[in-house]
């Protein structure tokens, strides 16, 4: 269980590689990266948005397939190719007027740490690097790309009394 007042959470920001996709990347014959994503993460993401949580994607990756996947789920805040993530995070806060305490961030590696040190609720997948685990309030029992996003979304929605309590839960 996440040791944080999850009723404070208004937005969840996810990294992609190692969080919503596993830590390996297959390459196409043309050398393009192919990522695998978890369908349960996808269901939880679209449900969370229907129930009032803002979901954002913040990644160093520049792959258009990532944008297509998450736009297809209804995610509006997709930030790709972020070399330094903290400046994009600050822009996100300014756009919506959020405070750090209202944000959950799920990351898995060194580039995520600057944001994770600021947010109210830093979380990570089971296979995150040791440095990220050390600063996380919660380490999921699930590895990146295997449903760790669903894990944290479900905990937030349950804490807020919204998990499967609504007709919106029964459809995409």
Language-model-detected regions and their locations in the chain:
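N-terminal charge/polar-biased segments
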Residues: 1-5, 162-165
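Mg2+-dependent phosphoryl-transfer enzymes with acidic/Ser/Thr/Gly-rich catalytic loops
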Residues: 31-34, 73, 77, 86-172
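Alpha-helical substrate-recognition element adjacent to the catalytic core
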Residues: 2-84
């Amino acid at each position: 269980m996440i040791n944080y007042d999850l009723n404070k959470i208004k937005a969840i920001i996810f990294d992609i590689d190692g969080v919503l996709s596993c830590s390996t990347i297959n390459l196409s014959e043309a050398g393009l990266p192919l990522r695998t994503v978890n369908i349960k993460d996808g269901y939880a993401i679209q449900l969370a948005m229907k129930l009032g949580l803002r979901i954002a994607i913040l990644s160093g990756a520049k792959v258009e397939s990532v944008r297509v996947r998450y736009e297809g789920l209804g995610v509006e805040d997709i930030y790709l190719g972020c070399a330094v993530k903290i400046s994009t995070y600050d822009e996100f806060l300014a756009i919506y007027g959020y405070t750090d305490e209202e944000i959950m961030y799920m990351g898995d590696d060194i580039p995520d740490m600057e944001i994770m040190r600021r947010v109210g609720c830093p979380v990570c997948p089971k296979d995150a690097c040791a440095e990220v685990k050390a600063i996380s309030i919660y380490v999921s029992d699930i590895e990146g790309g295997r449903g760790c996003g669903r894990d944290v979304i479900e905990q937030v929605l349950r804490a807020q009394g919204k998990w499967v309590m609504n007709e919106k839960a029964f459809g995409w």
